[in-house]
Amino acid sequence: MLKVFNTLTRRLEDFKPLEPPLVRMYVCGPTVYDHSHIGHARTWVAFDIIKKYLRLKGYNVIHVQNITDIDDKIINRARELGVSWKEVADTYTNEYFELMKKLKVFPTVHPRVTDHIDDIIEFVQDLVDKGYAYVTQSGVYFDVDKYPYYGQLSGIKDKKMWSQEEFVKDKKNPYDFALWKCAKPGEPWWDSPWCKGRPGWHIECSTMSSKYLGKQFDVHGGARDLIFPHHENEIAQSEARFGVRPWVKYWLHSGYLTVKGEKMSKSLGNIVPLKDVLKSFEPEVVRYWLSSAHYRTELDFSWERLEEAKRSLTRMRMTVDELRKIVKKESPKGKLDEWEIKAIYEVSKIRNEFYDAMDNDFNTPEAWAAVREALRLGNKAIEEGSWEVSLAVLEFVNEADKVFEVFEERVHEGVEPFIDLLVEVRSKLREMKQWELADYIRSKLDELGVKLLDKGKETEWRFA
């Protein structure tokens, strides 16, 4: 039975969606005012893995991940650059899509705030009509005192602890939050019943999630720093409008990505743009590294740790490539020896360990331990030339990779004969003791991603 840690109840719970096998999941996406960084990717990859595991378990997952393309940060950034707010939003939205494609993160729906202004106005008007919101000269605000359950997600019940997002004189209470902001001179605006203006931050997610997932849904995800006030405010306005509790059944939050123990943030100047990481490392290496820690724990970034992840993944890929070669080129022998029978049984046990790990709140470190254990058996199968054990290991790895997506078979059509020729030439050079030229061929092949393994007078090669 799959168990998930629910931030709302602060405990592990059996995962029972509202309308199985359907799972409706909303994840907070980017505010597109600057480059996405590796900390953002930590959240997006984590929930992509969660989605793909749920699908592996037989659930039909609708995954909505929004794009906030109008916000104070975007307006301020446009002023800094001397361009329009839309140019800023479009530039970083396009970059975000390119990065998500590389990381193989594909939500079902990617709604943008500016495409849902009418829906947002309708949501705000409903809250005003029901007495949960009030209109002032500066905008429309949610009356937090009218909602008795405020603080249920974060556990922050003391009003003195409630944050004031911005100082506005005409609010009833300092902790009331904006649903609609009247535009100041030079700011973008849309017509509304109250004033020319734009949506507040929190109302956007409530509106878009309910539009695509309904008045009540299964999973809401995001980074831990969104718990308060963003997710707290989402709950307040959504439960006030729809009259349902809980509005979302399971709240899941990813841990911080840190640098030398400090949270990655602009204020600390330790941001690492995701595009820079992907210039140096394959997307699969980034996915592997991000999933090497449990999604709720902190993960400390360093280039050295990514290099370690690259080396680890390279070793695993080499084994997987060899297993694929054996399964494609060799044939089953029919009769198994004692080791093969035992090994195939071990693979089935390892498969169960993988599912047990992922069923325990998506414990990816333990799931990866199961994959590595299977690949150790795979290496033995390669040494023994066992087609049957190779197949058993490969089938399990392919199954696990539906979640992790790092072992995609790489196509090298037409290059094998040329590599074989170079390896043969190098062997001749070694026989002639032309070590310098032989080493030159090895180094050049290595640069091209081809690893040579000298075994006495014989040489084998693999794609790295």
UniProtKB/Swiss-Prot annotation:
A motif ('HIGH' region) lies at residues 30-40. It comes from Ignicoccus hospitalis (strain KIN4/I / DSM 18386 / JCM 14125). One of its GO terms (cellular component) is cytoplasm. Zn(2+) binds at C28, C205, H230, E234. A motif ('KMSKS' region) lies at residues 263-267. It holds the Pfam family tRNA-synt_1e. One of its GO terms (molecular function) is ATP binding. The keyword Transcription regulation does not apply. ATP binds at K266. This is Cysteine--tRNA ligase. GO terms for biological process: cysteinyl-tRNA aminoacylation. It is found in: Cytoplasm. NCBIfam families: cysS. Its main location: cytoplasm. Keywords: Aminoacyl-tRNA synthetase, ATP-binding, Cytoplasm, Ligase, Metal-binding, Nucleotide-binding, Protein biosynthesis, Zinc. The gene is cysS. Its cofactor is Zn(2+). PANTHER family: CYSTEINE--TRNA LIGASE, CYTOPLASMIC (PTHR10890:SF3), CYSTEINYL-TRNA SYNTHETASE (PTHR10890). It catalyses: tRNA(Cys) + L-cysteine + ATP = L-cysteinyl-tRNA(Cys) + AMP + diphosphate. SMART domains: DALR_2. Belongs to the class-I aminoacyl-tRNA synthetase family. Its EC number is 6.1.1.16.
